[in-house]
């Protein structure tokens, strides 16, 4: 695949508890397996994650809506 960029974006409406469960599952992949797996177009991809990463957390609170953005990069 060389230097091809693979980007997966997913957005869905969930309950707060279901969203927390998705975040826990992602955290478990990082902590236990040192990687993140995802499926795109029927193919399974694995992103290996090094021992040290950069974590960015952004919280926006507004009258018309609020959001939390979490980004992990390496």
Task: List the predicted regions and their residue ranges.
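Extended, compositionally biased eukaryotic interaction scaffolds
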Residues: 1-16
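C-terminal edge-of-domain segments
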Residues: 53-74
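Short, structured protein-protein interaction patches enriched in aromatics and acidic/basic residues
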Residues: 10, 32-56
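Solvent-exposed loop and beta-edge segments used for protein-protein assembly and interaction
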Residues: 28-32, 49, 62-64
């Amino acid at each position: 695949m060389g230097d091809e960029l693979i980007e997966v974006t997913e957005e869905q409406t969930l309950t707060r508890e279901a969203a927390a469960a998705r975040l826990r599952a992602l955290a478990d992949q990082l902590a236990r397996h040192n990687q993140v797996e995802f499926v795109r177009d029927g193919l399974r991809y694995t992103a290996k994650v090094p021992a040290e990463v950069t974590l960015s957390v952004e919280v926006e609170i507004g009258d018309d809506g609020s959001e939390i953005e979490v980004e992990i990069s390496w």
